[in-house]
Amino acid sequence: DQAAELIRLSSQKIKSFKSKGEISNLVTQTDVEADKLITKKIKESFPEHNIVSEELGSNNLSSDYTWYIDPIDGTNNFVHNYPSFAVSIGVFLKGKPVVGVVYDIPNNEKFFASKGGGSFSNDSPISVSEKDHFNEGLYVTGFIPYDENYIDKNLQVIKNINLNSHGVRRLGAASLDMCHVAKGIVEGFWEYLSLIHISEPTRLSA
């Protein structure tokens, strides 16, 4: 919550940023500050756990538990005040996801899920869509905007889905996209080059 408040306050100001190699791969000082704050809190409560964070790198304490942190998923949106960005944190036990939290900051919506414990939005249970026909669904996607090969691959898939469904959206924050699948407001999420499998398939996705 403290990191989310830091990001919320920063979103109201003019933001300086730099690119991490490619023109559309941005990082802000707020990314770094939020990452430091989250990492500090985890270390205070779980000093023996491994931590992998987008801006600060990783440690390796040989723990069965590993925390994955993206302090601002959707940094480009954050820079442009486009209201789709979130704090995303996951916990893995022996390589398997057991807890996930995604905080949709512009909409003040906190998603939470735990293995065997269900999925929630602001303490209300959520579930995936009940639709049984692919062509009745709305879908979301993401792709790395600075890799031409993967853009081309994604565009072909997007074209096929778009022609056979209610459409495809790309909002620029994959963690929120997958939460929207979990909430049932879209039917599936597609992306090439996901580094870690962090979502279960919906009724309609392969």
Which positions does each model-derived feature cover?
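DPxDG-like acidic metal-binding loop motif
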Residues: L61-F120
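Short, solvent-exposed loop/turn motifs
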Residues: P97, P125-S127
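Generic detector of well-ordered alpha-helical packing
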Residues: V32, K36, E55, P71-G74, ...
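N-terminal subdomain of lithium-sensitive/metallo-dependent phosphomonoesterases centered on the IMPase/IPPase/PAP
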Residues: D1-I72
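An extended, acidic
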Residues: S127-S199, R203
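Residue-level signal for inorganic ion chemistry
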Residues: I7, D31, I42, T75, ...
